[in-house]
C-alpha cells in the first residue's frame, strides 16, 4: 500500500489501478532498481542515450499501453488513455531521471495532435508504431497564427530508411 505523498519505490503499490497496470508499473520500477542509483546517475551525467530503456519500453509495450486511446487500441482493454495511469507512469519516470521522463513526455505531446485529429489513417499508424516500440514527437511552427495544434492536420513522414522514429 502507498501511504506517502512522496514516491518510494520500495513501498509503491497503486491499489486503485487495475492489476495489469500495476504489474507494468512494478516492472518499470524493478527495471530502474536493477540498474542501481550509481548507474542511473552516471548515465544521466554522461548523457547516455537510453537505448536499453527504450528496449524495455518496446518489450513491455509501455508506450503502446498507456497513451493509446481505447478507440485506437484494436480491442485491447489494457490499452487506454487514462489520466490516473499516465500520472503514475510520469511520476516514476520523473523520479528516476529526466531522460526517461522526456522520452515519455515527447511521445505524449507528439500523440496529442494525432489523437485529436479526424485522421483515422494517422491514428492507426501511430497506434501501430507505438505497438512496435516507437517513440513519437511532434513539432509545428506557423508564421500566420502560431502553433495551433487544434486546427492543423500535419503529417511528417520519417526520412527514407528510418522506421518508427522521425528526426
Predicted regions mapped to residue ranges:
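Active-site-proximal "nucleotidyltransferase
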Residues: 139
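Hydrophobic/aromatic beta-strand elements that line small-molecule binding cavities or substrate pockets
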Residues: 153-156
